[in-house]
Protein backbone atom coordinates (compact mmCIF):
# COMPACT_ATOMS: atom_id res chain seq x y z
CA UNK A 1 0.00 0.00 0.00
CA UNK A 2 1.07 3.58 -0.63
CA UNK A 3 0.94 4.49 3.07
CA UNK A 4 3.12 1.51 4.00
CA UNK A 5 5.68 2.58 1.42
CA UNK A 6 5.75 6.08 2.89
CA UNK A 7 6.05 4.82 6.46
CA UNK A 8 8.99 2.59 5.52
CA UNK A 9 10.97 5.71 4.61
CA UNK A 10 10.24 7.53 7.88
CA UNK A 11 11.81 7.34 11.30
CA UNK A 12 9.76 6.06 14.24
CA UNK A 13 9.09 9.62 15.43
CA UNK A 14 8.02 10.73 11.95
CA UNK A 15 5.75 7.70 11.59
CA UNK A 16 4.02 8.51 14.88
CA UNK A 17 3.61 12.15 13.89
CA UNK A 18 2.20 11.22 10.48
CA UNK A 19 -0.27 8.73 11.94
CA UNK A 20 -1.43 11.32 14.48
CA UNK A 21 -1.98 13.84 11.69
CA UNK A 22 -3.92 11.31 9.63
CA UNK A 23 -6.08 10.48 12.63
CA UNK A 24 -6.70 14.17 13.25
CA UNK A 25 -7.65 14.62 9.60
CA UNK A 26 -10.07 11.69 9.79
CA UNK A 27 -11.68 13.11 12.93
CA UNK A 28 -12.04 16.48 11.24
CA UNK A 29 -13.70 14.94 8.20
CA UNK A 30 -16.10 12.98 10.40
CA UNK A 31 -17.25 16.15 12.15
CA UNK A 32 -17.41 18.27 9.00
CA UNK A 33 -19.27 15.94 6.67
CA UNK A 34 -21.67 18.67 5.63
CA UNK A 35 -18.79 20.63 4.09
CA UNK A 36 -18.37 17.87 1.51
CA UNK A 37 -22.03 17.89 0.53
CA UNK A 38 -22.58 18.68 -3.16
CA UNK A 39 -26.24 19.41 -3.93
CA UNK A 40 -28.18 17.94 -6.82
CA UNK A 41 -29.89 20.38 -9.17
CA UNK A 42 -33.22 20.34 -7.28
CA UNK A 43 -31.45 20.68 -3.95
CA UNK A 44 -29.51 23.62 -5.30
CA UNK A 45 -32.77 25.21 -6.43
CA UNK A 46 -34.01 24.90 -2.84
CA UNK A 47 -30.83 26.48 -1.50
CA UNK A 48 -31.01 29.28 -4.07
CA UNK A 49 -34.57 30.06 -3.00
CA UNK A 50 -33.32 31.37 0.33
CA UNK A 51 -31.88 34.36 -1.50
CA UNK A 52 -35.08 35.48 -3.22
CA UNK A 53 -37.87 34.18 -0.98
CA UNK A 54 -38.64 34.57 2.72
CA UNK A 55 -40.29 31.14 2.94
CA UNK A 56 -39.27 28.13 0.92
CA UNK A 57 -40.59 24.60 0.91
CA UNK A 58 -38.86 21.43 -0.18
CA UNK A 59 -41.48 18.91 -1.23
CA UNK A 60 -39.69 15.57 -1.37
CA UNK A 61 -40.07 11.85 -1.62
CA UNK A 62 -37.26 10.74 0.71
CA UNK A 63 -37.22 11.87 4.31
CA UNK A 64 -33.45 11.61 4.78
CA UNK A 65 -32.81 14.02 1.93
CA UNK A 66 -35.42 16.43 3.23
CA UNK A 67 -33.94 16.51 6.73
CA UNK A 68 -30.41 16.81 5.38
CA UNK A 69 -31.35 19.76 3.19
CA UNK A 70 -33.18 21.47 6.03
CA UNK A 71 -30.17 21.05 8.27
CA UNK A 72 -27.84 22.19 5.54
CA UNK A 73 -29.65 25.50 5.50
CA UNK A 74 -29.94 25.61 9.29
CA UNK A 75 -26.27 24.82 9.85
CA UNK A 76 -25.04 27.57 7.59
CA UNK A 77 -27.58 30.10 8.78
CA UNK A 78 -26.10 29.92 12.27
CA UNK A 79 -22.40 30.79 11.80
CA UNK A 80 -21.00 33.62 9.79
CA UNK A 81 -17.21 33.77 9.95
CA UNK A 82 -15.00 34.03 6.89
CA UNK A 83 -14.09 30.34 6.89
CA UNK A 84 -17.73 29.25 6.97
CA UNK A 85 -18.68 31.62 4.16
CA UNK A 86 -15.94 30.24 1.91
CA UNK A 87 -16.99 26.69 2.71
CA UNK A 88 -20.64 27.15 1.88
CA UNK A 89 -19.85 28.85 -1.40
CA UNK A 90 -17.48 26.06 -2.33
CA UNK A 91 -19.92 23.42 -1.20
CA UNK A 92 -22.78 24.57 -3.41
CA UNK A 93 -20.52 25.64 -6.28
CA UNK A 94 -21.97 29.14 -6.28
CA UNK A 95 -19.00 31.41 -5.79
CA UNK A 96 -19.78 33.14 -9.06
CA UNK A 97 -23.50 33.72 -8.41
CA UNK A 98 -23.43 35.38 -4.99
CA UNK A 99 -26.85 33.89 -4.20
CA UNK A 100 -25.98 32.42 -0.82
CA UNK A 101 -26.53 34.83 2.03
CA UNK A 102 -24.49 34.17 5.18
CA UNK A 103 -25.04 36.26 8.25
CA UNK A 104 -22.10 37.97 9.91
CA UNK A 105 -23.79 38.29 13.28
CA UNK A 106 -25.10 36.30 16.23
CA UNK A 107 -28.24 34.43 15.23
CA UNK A 108 -30.94 32.28 16.76
CA UNK A 109 -33.16 29.77 15.02
CA UNK A 110 -35.77 27.14 15.77
CA UNK A 111 -36.33 23.67 14.31
CA UNK A 112 -39.63 21.89 14.89
CA UNK A 113 -41.04 18.43 14.28
CA UNK A 114 -44.27 16.59 15.05
CA UNK A 115 -42.99 14.76 18.15
CA UNK A 116 -39.90 14.51 20.34
CA UNK A 117 -39.00 11.30 18.53
CA UNK A 118 -39.16 12.83 15.06
CA UNK A 119 -36.95 15.68 16.24
CA UNK A 120 -34.29 13.48 17.85
CA UNK A 121 -34.17 10.88 15.08
CA UNK A 122 -34.15 13.25 12.12
CA UNK A 123 -33.02 16.86 12.26
CA UNK A 124 -31.20 16.67 15.59
CA UNK A 125 -29.39 13.45 14.63
CA UNK A 126 -28.20 14.85 11.33
CA UNK A 127 -26.96 18.12 12.77
CA UNK A 128 -25.56 16.97 16.10
CA UNK A 129 -25.13 13.21 15.81
CA UNK A 130 -26.59 10.54 18.08
CA UNK A 131 -26.47 12.24 21.46
CA UNK A 132 -27.29 9.00 23.27
CA UNK A 133 -24.19 7.34 21.79
CA UNK A 134 -21.85 10.33 22.18
CA UNK A 135 -19.22 9.05 19.79
CA UNK A 136 -21.15 9.32 16.54
CA UNK A 137 -20.83 12.81 15.05
CA UNK A 138 -23.43 14.73 13.14
CA UNK A 139 -23.05 16.15 9.67
CA UNK A 140 -22.80 19.76 10.69
CA UNK A 141 -20.62 21.00 13.50
CA UNK A 142 -17.25 20.06 14.96
CA UNK A 143 -17.61 19.21 18.64
CA UNK A 144 -15.08 21.81 19.69
CA UNK A 145 -17.28 24.56 18.24
CA UNK A 146 -20.56 23.42 19.70
CA UNK A 147 -22.35 22.71 22.95
CA UNK A 148 -25.86 21.72 23.92
CA UNK A 149 -28.38 21.49 26.71
CA UNK A 150 -30.46 18.33 27.08
CA UNK A 151 -34.09 18.06 28.03
CA UNK A 152 -34.69 17.09 31.65
CA UNK A 153 -37.60 14.90 30.54
CA UNK A 154 -36.10 13.09 27.55
CA UNK A 155 -32.34 12.86 27.95
CA UNK A 156 -31.62 12.25 24.27
CA UNK A 157 -33.57 15.36 23.26
CA UNK A 158 -31.68 18.62 22.94
CA UNK A 159 -33.54 21.80 23.71
CA UNK A 160 -30.73 24.21 22.79
CA UNK A 161 -27.78 23.74 20.46
CA UNK A 162 -25.09 26.44 20.62
CA UNK A 163 -22.44 27.08 18.00
CA UNK A 164 -19.49 29.37 18.59
CA UNK A 165 -17.99 31.37 15.74
CA UNK A 166 -16.16 34.59 15.06
CA UNK A 167 -17.15 37.75 13.32
CA UNK A 168 -14.34 38.72 11.01
CA UNK A 169 -12.22 36.20 12.96
CA UNK A 170 -12.01 38.59 15.92
CA UNK A 171 -15.18 38.78 18.01
CA UNK A 172 -16.31 35.41 19.34
CA UNK A 173 -20.05 34.85 19.21
CA UNK A 174 -22.56 32.13 20.01
CA UNK A 175 -25.47 31.39 17.71
CA UNK A 176 -28.15 29.06 19.01
CA UNK A 177 -30.76 26.68 17.66
CA UNK A 178 -33.85 25.59 19.60
CA UNK A 179 -35.29 22.10 19.01
CA UNK A 180 -39.02 21.79 19.61
CA UNK A 181 -41.79 19.31 19.00
CA UNK A 182 -44.94 20.99 17.76
CA UNK A 183 -47.70 18.54 18.58
CA UNK A 184 -49.36 21.34 20.52
CA UNK A 185 -49.71 24.91 19.30
CA UNK A 186 -48.15 26.41 22.44
CA UNK A 187 -44.89 24.55 21.85
CA UNK A 188 -44.32 26.55 18.68
CA UNK A 189 -44.46 29.82 20.60
CA UNK A 190 -41.42 31.38 22.21
CA UNK A 191 -38.79 34.06 21.83
CA UNK A 192 -38.15 36.11 18.73
CA UNK A 193 -35.73 34.26 16.47
CA UNK A 194 -33.98 34.85 13.15
CA UNK A 195 -35.15 31.77 11.24
CA UNK A 196 -37.55 28.88 11.67
CA UNK A 197 -37.56 25.42 10.12
CA UNK A 198 -40.23 22.72 10.20
CA UNK A 199 -40.38 19.16 8.95
CA UNK A 200 -43.33 16.90 8.16
CA UNK A 201 -46.90 17.82 7.25
CA UNK A 202 -47.70 20.11 10.19
CA UNK A 203 -50.91 22.14 10.58
CA UNK A 204 -50.68 25.59 9.05
CA UNK A 205 -51.40 27.16 12.45
CA UNK A 206 -48.13 25.69 13.73
CA UNK A 207 -46.24 27.04 10.75
CA UNK A 208 -47.87 30.46 11.19
CA UNK A 209 -46.93 30.55 14.87
CA UNK A 210 -43.33 29.72 14.05
CA UNK A 211 -43.33 32.36 11.34
CA UNK A 212 -44.55 34.93 13.87
CA UNK A 213 -41.41 34.27 15.92
CA UNK A 214 -39.36 35.61 12.98
CA UNK A 215 -41.36 38.78 12.19
CA UNK A 216 -38.65 41.08 13.53
CA UNK A 217 -36.01 39.64 11.19
CA UNK A 218 -38.00 39.25 7.97
CA UNK A 219 -39.88 35.96 8.39
CA UNK A 220 -37.21 33.60 7.04
CA UNK A 221 -38.50 30.04 7.23
CA UNK A 222 -38.12 26.63 5.60
CA UNK A 223 -40.41 23.60 5.48
CA UNK A 224 -39.64 20.09 4.25
CA UNK A 225 -42.13 17.28 3.87
CA UNK A 226 -43.09 14.10 2.04
CA UNK A 227 -46.88 14.17 1.47
CA UNK A 228 -47.50 10.47 1.98
CA UNK A 229 -50.48 11.09 4.28
CA UNK A 230 -52.22 13.48 1.92
CA UNK A 231 -52.88 17.20 2.01
CA UNK A 232 -52.72 18.94 5.39
CA UNK A 233 -53.87 22.55 5.47
CA UNK A 234 -50.23 23.66 5.58
CA UNK A 235 -49.32 21.61 2.53
CA UNK A 236 -52.43 22.89 0.76
CA UNK A 237 -51.50 26.52 1.44
CA UNK A 238 -48.05 26.17 -0.09
CA UNK A 239 -48.90 23.99 -3.06
CA UNK A 240 -52.09 25.69 -4.18
CA UNK A 241 -51.88 29.28 -3.02
CA UNK A 242 -48.29 30.37 -2.30
CA UNK A 243 -47.66 34.06 -1.70
CA UNK A 244 -45.05 36.07 -3.57
CA UNK A 245 -42.57 35.49 -0.74
CA UNK A 246 -43.01 31.71 -0.77
CA UNK A 247 -41.25 29.22 -3.03
CA UNK A 248 -42.07 25.53 -3.45
CA UNK A 249 -39.49 23.07 -4.83
CA UNK A 250 -40.61 19.54 -5.75
CA UNK A 251 -37.87 16.89 -5.72
CA UNK A 252 -38.78 13.41 -6.96
CA UNK A 253 -36.85 10.16 -6.87
CA UNK A 254 -35.88 10.91 -10.47
CA UNK A 255 -33.95 13.95 -9.18
CA UNK A 256 -31.87 11.77 -6.83
CA UNK A 257 -28.75 11.61 -8.96
CA UNK A 258 -26.99 8.89 -6.95
CA UNK A 259 -29.49 6.27 -8.18
CA UNK A 260 -29.28 4.62 -11.58
CA UNK A 261 -32.46 4.40 -13.66
CA UNK A 262 -32.66 0.70 -12.84
CA UNK A 263 -32.36 1.36 -9.11
CA UNK A 264 -35.06 4.03 -9.24
CA UNK A 265 -37.52 1.68 -10.91
CA UNK A 266 -36.63 -1.11 -8.48
CA UNK A 267 -37.25 1.17 -5.49
CA UNK A 268 -40.59 2.38 -6.86
CA UNK A 269 -41.74 -1.17 -7.62
CA UNK A 270 -40.99 -2.23 -4.04
CA UNK A 271 -43.72 0.04 -2.63
CA UNK A 272 -47.41 -0.88 -2.54
CA UNK A 273 -49.11 0.35 -5.69
CA UNK A 274 -51.28 2.90 -3.89
CA UNK A 275 -48.17 4.53 -2.35
CA UNK A 276 -45.97 4.68 -5.44
CA UNK A 277 -46.94 8.12 -6.70
CA UNK A 278 -46.45 9.65 -3.25
CA UNK A 279 -43.19 7.80 -2.61
CA UNK A 280 -41.67 8.34 -6.06
CA UNK A 281 -42.89 11.81 -6.98
CA UNK A 282 -44.24 13.30 -3.79
CA UNK A 283 -47.77 13.46 -5.22
CA UNK A 284 -50.10 13.94 -2.25
CA UNK A 285 -53.28 11.96 -1.93
CA UNK A 286 -56.13 14.21 -3.04
CA UNK A 287 -59.08 13.83 -0.71
CA UNK A 288 -61.60 14.68 -3.44
CA UNK A 289 -59.95 12.96 -6.38
CA UNK A 290 -56.93 13.55 -8.59
CA UNK A 291 -58.06 14.15 -12.18
CA UNK A 292 -55.18 12.59 -14.10
CA UNK A 293 -54.78 9.24 -12.36
CA UNK A 294 -52.43 8.16 -15.11
CA UNK A 295 -48.81 6.99 -14.62
CA UNK A 296 -46.43 9.61 -16.00
CA UNK A 297 -44.36 7.00 -17.81
CA UNK A 298 -47.29 6.22 -20.11
CA UNK A 299 -47.34 9.75 -21.54
CA UNK A 300 -43.65 10.72 -21.32
CA UNK A 301 -41.42 10.49 -24.37
CA UNK A 302 -37.95 11.54 -25.45
CA UNK A 303 -37.67 14.83 -27.39
CA UNK A 304 -37.23 14.65 -31.16
CA UNK A 305 -37.12 17.03 -34.12
CA UNK A 306 -40.48 18.03 -35.52
CA UNK A 307 -41.20 16.15 -38.79
CA UNK A 308 -42.28 18.23 -41.77
CA UNK A 309 -45.75 16.69 -41.91
CA UNK A 310 -46.65 17.56 -38.29
CA UNK A 311 -49.06 20.43 -37.65
CA UNK A 312 -47.83 22.92 -35.04
CA UNK A 313 -49.71 25.35 -32.83
CA UNK A 314 -48.64 27.42 -29.82
CA UNK A 315 -50.96 28.43 -27.00
CA UNK A 316 -50.79 30.62 -23.93
CA UNK A 317 -52.50 31.36 -20.66
CA UNK A 318 -52.21 34.98 -19.52
CA UNK A 319 -50.99 35.80 -16.04
CA UNK A 320 -49.19 38.33 -13.90
CA UNK A 321 -49.57 37.52 -10.19
CA UNK A 322 -49.91 33.88 -11.14
CA UNK A 323 -47.63 32.57 -13.90
CA UNK A 324 -48.33 33.00 -17.57
CA UNK A 325 -47.66 29.89 -19.63
CA UNK A 326 -46.68 29.28 -23.25
CA UNK A 327 -46.70 25.84 -24.84
CA UNK A 328 -46.13 24.29 -28.25
CA UNK A 329 -48.29 21.39 -29.41
CA UNK A 330 -47.44 19.13 -32.36
CA UNK A 331 -50.09 17.08 -34.12
CA UNK A 332 -49.29 14.02 -36.18
CA UNK A 333 -52.57 14.20 -38.08
CA UNK A 334 -52.01 10.90 -39.91
CA UNK A 335 -51.72 8.93 -36.66
CA UNK A 336 -53.88 11.40 -34.69
CA UNK A 337 -51.24 11.68 -31.96
CA UNK A 338 -50.41 14.90 -30.10
CA UNK A 339 -47.04 15.87 -28.64
CA UNK A 340 -46.51 18.60 -26.06
CA UNK A 341 -43.02 19.65 -27.10
CA UNK A 342 -42.22 22.95 -25.38
CA UNK A 343 -43.27 24.73 -22.20
CA UNK A 344 -42.42 28.08 -20.64
CA UNK A 345 -43.98 29.42 -17.43
CA UNK A 346 -43.21 32.51 -15.36
CA UNK A 347 -44.88 35.16 -13.18
CA UNK A 348 -44.66 38.94 -13.53
CA UNK A 349 -43.33 39.01 -17.08
CA UNK A 350 -44.54 41.44 -19.72
CA UNK A 351 -45.47 40.43 -23.25
CA UNK A 352 -42.08 41.66 -24.47
CA UNK A 353 -40.24 39.61 -21.85
CA UNK A 354 -42.29 36.53 -22.68
CA UNK A 355 -41.54 36.93 -26.37
CA UNK A 356 -37.84 37.14 -25.65
CA UNK A 357 -38.04 33.87 -23.71
CA UNK A 358 -39.90 31.84 -26.36
CA UNK A 359 -39.06 33.56 -29.65
CA UNK A 360 -36.63 30.82 -30.66
CA UNK A 361 -39.48 28.33 -30.99
CA UNK A 362 -42.59 30.54 -31.22
CA UNK A 363 -41.67 32.75 -34.18
CA UNK A 364 -44.41 32.75 -36.85
CA UNK A 365 -46.34 29.94 -35.13
CA UNK A 366 -50.07 30.68 -34.58
CA UNK A 367 -50.98 31.17 -30.92
CA UNK A 368 -54.24 30.11 -29.28
CA UNK A 369 -55.33 32.31 -26.37
CA UNK A 370 -58.19 32.45 -23.82
CA UNK A 371 -61.12 34.85 -23.70
CA UNK A 372 -59.46 37.10 -21.09
CA UNK A 373 -57.17 38.26 -23.90
CA UNK A 374 -59.95 40.74 -24.68
CA UNK A 375 -59.43 42.43 -21.31
CA UNK A 376 -57.64 45.74 -20.90
CA UNK A 377 -57.06 46.15 -17.19
CA UNK A 378 -54.31 43.54 -16.69
CA UNK A 379 -51.90 45.38 -18.92
CA UNK A 380 -53.39 48.86 -18.72
CA UNK A 381 -54.51 50.33 -22.05
CA UNK A 382 -54.41 47.90 -24.97
CA UNK A 383 -56.07 44.52 -24.94
CA UNK A 384 -53.83 41.71 -23.77
CA UNK A 385 -54.15 40.02 -27.16
CA UNK A 386 -52.94 43.20 -28.88
CA UNK A 387 -50.03 43.61 -26.46
CA UNK A 388 -48.79 40.13 -27.24
CA UNK A 389 -49.32 40.56 -30.97
CA UNK A 390 -47.30 43.79 -30.86
CA UNK A 391 -44.54 41.96 -28.96
CA UNK A 392 -44.20 39.42 -31.78
CA UNK A 393 -46.66 36.60 -31.10
CA UNK A 394 -48.80 35.40 -34.03
CA UNK A 395 -52.09 35.57 -32.15
CA UNK A 396 -55.05 33.79 -33.75
CA UNK A 397 -57.93 36.16 -34.64
CA UNK A 398 -60.36 34.71 -32.08
CA UNK A 399 -60.03 33.35 -28.56
CA UNK A 400 -59.91 29.60 -28.03
CA UNK A 401 -63.11 27.61 -28.41
CA UNK A 402 -64.11 24.18 -29.62
CA UNK A 403 -65.35 23.93 -33.23
CA UNK A 404 -68.94 24.27 -31.98
CA UNK A 405 -68.09 27.52 -30.16
CA UNK A 406 -68.02 26.10 -26.64
CA UNK A 407 -65.10 26.34 -24.23
CA UNK A 408 -65.99 23.95 -21.40
CA UNK A 409 -63.06 23.13 -19.15
CA UNK A 410 -64.59 19.75 -18.34
CA UNK A 411 -64.89 18.84 -22.02
CA UNK A 412 -61.31 19.82 -22.75
CA UNK A 413 -59.89 17.92 -19.80
CA UNK A 414 -62.01 14.88 -20.59
CA UNK A 415 -60.78 14.75 -24.18
CA UNK A 416 -57.14 15.19 -23.17
CA UNK A 417 -57.45 12.46 -20.54
CA UNK A 418 -58.98 10.08 -23.08
CA UNK A 419 -56.11 10.78 -25.48
CA UNK A 420 -53.60 10.02 -22.72
CA UNK A 421 -55.31 6.74 -21.86
CA UNK A 422 -55.32 5.75 -25.54
CA UNK A 423 -51.62 6.56 -25.96
CA UNK A 424 -52.37 9.46 -28.32
CA UNK A 425 -51.13 12.33 -26.14
CA UNK A 426 -47.41 12.41 -25.36
CA UNK A 427 -45.31 14.92 -23.44
CA UNK A 428 -41.58 15.48 -23.90
CA UNK A 429 -39.77 14.59 -20.70
CA UNK A 430 -38.22 18.08 -20.77
CA UNK A 431 -41.61 19.68 -20.01
CA UNK A 432 -41.39 19.43 -16.21
CA UNK A 433 -43.75 22.40 -15.52
CA UNK A 434 -46.50 20.38 -17.20
CA UNK A 435 -45.90 17.37 -14.95
CA UNK A 436 -45.78 19.52 -11.81
CA UNK A 437 -49.34 20.66 -12.56
CA UNK A 438 -50.43 17.25 -13.87
CA UNK A 439 -49.59 15.64 -10.52
CA UNK A 440 -51.76 17.98 -8.44
CA UNK A 441 -54.73 18.73 -10.68
CA UNK A 442 -57.81 17.66 -8.72
CA UNK A 443 -61.41 18.32 -7.74
CA UNK A 444 -62.69 19.95 -4.56
CA UNK A 445 -65.14 18.45 -2.10
CA UNK A 446 -68.01 19.47 -4.41
CA UNK A 447 -66.51 17.70 -7.40
CA UNK A 448 -65.45 20.89 -9.17
CA UNK A 449 -62.02 21.26 -10.77
CA UNK A 450 -59.73 23.35 -8.55
CA UNK A 451 -58.52 26.16 -10.81
CA UNK A 452 -55.14 26.89 -9.27
CA UNK A 453 -51.65 25.96 -10.44
CA UNK A 454 -53.06 25.02 -13.85
CA UNK A 455 -51.46 27.55 -16.21
CA UNK A 456 -49.66 25.04 -18.45
CA UNK A 457 -52.65 22.70 -18.45
CA UNK A 458 -54.92 25.56 -19.50
CA UNK A 459 -52.57 26.60 -22.31
CA UNK A 460 -52.39 22.99 -23.48
CA UNK A 461 -56.17 22.80 -23.53
CA UNK A 462 -56.41 26.01 -25.60
CA UNK A 463 -53.94 24.66 -28.15
CA UNK A 464 -55.86 21.41 -28.43
CA UNK A 465 -59.19 23.25 -28.82
CA UNK A 466 -57.84 25.37 -31.69
CA UNK A 467 -55.93 22.60 -33.50
CA UNK A 468 -58.28 22.73 -36.52
CA UNK A 469 -57.99 26.51 -36.95
CA UNK A 470 -54.30 27.09 -37.36
CA UNK A 471 -54.21 27.73 -41.12
CA UNK A 472 -52.26 24.52 -41.74
CA UNK A 473 -49.24 25.89 -39.88
CA UNK A 474 -46.22 23.63 -40.13
CA UNK A 475 -42.48 23.94 -39.59
From Swiss-Prot:
Region called Interaction with the terminase small subunit, residue ranges: 1-58
Chain residue ranges for the region called Nuclease activity: 308-475
Textual note on the cofactor: Nuclease activity probably requires 2 Mg(2+) ions per subunit.
Name of a matching Pfam family: Terminase_6C
Keywords per UniProt: ATP-binding, Endonuclease, Hydrolase, Late protein, Magnesium, Metal-binding, Nuclease, Nucleotide-binding, Viral genome packaging, Viral release from host cell
Assembly information from the UniProt record: Interacts with the terminase small subunit; the active complex is composed of dimer of terminase large subunits and a nonamer ring of terminase small subunits. Interacts with the portal protein; this interaction allows the packaging of viral DNA.
Family to which the UniProt record says this protein belongs: Belongs to the Lederbergvirus large terminase family.
Role noted for this protein: The terminase large subunit acts as an ATP driven molecular motor necessary for viral DNA translocation into empty capsids and as an endonuclease that cuts the viral genome to initiate and to end a packaging reaction. The terminase lies at a unique vertex of the procapsid and is composed of two subunits, a small terminase subunit involved in viral DNA recognition (packaging 'pac' sequence), and a large terminase subunit possessing endonucleolytic and ATPase activities. Both terminase subunits heterooligomerize and are docked on the portal protein to form the packaging machine.
Protein name: Terminase, large subunit
Species this chain originates from: Enterobacteria phage LP7
Amino acid sequence: MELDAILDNLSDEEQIELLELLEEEENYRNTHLLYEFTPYSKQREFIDAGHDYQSDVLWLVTSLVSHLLALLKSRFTLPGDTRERKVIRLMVNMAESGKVSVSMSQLSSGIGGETNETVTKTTQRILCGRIEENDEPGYGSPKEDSSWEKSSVLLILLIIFSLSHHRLMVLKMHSICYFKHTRRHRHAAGDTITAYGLTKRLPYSIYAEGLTRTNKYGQFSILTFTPLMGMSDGVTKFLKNPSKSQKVVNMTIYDAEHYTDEQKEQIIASYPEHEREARARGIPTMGSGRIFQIPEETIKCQPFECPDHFYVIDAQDFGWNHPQAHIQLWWDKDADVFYLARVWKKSENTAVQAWGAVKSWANKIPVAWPHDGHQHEKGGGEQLKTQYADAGFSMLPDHATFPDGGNSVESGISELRDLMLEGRFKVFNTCEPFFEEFRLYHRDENGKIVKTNDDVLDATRYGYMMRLRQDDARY
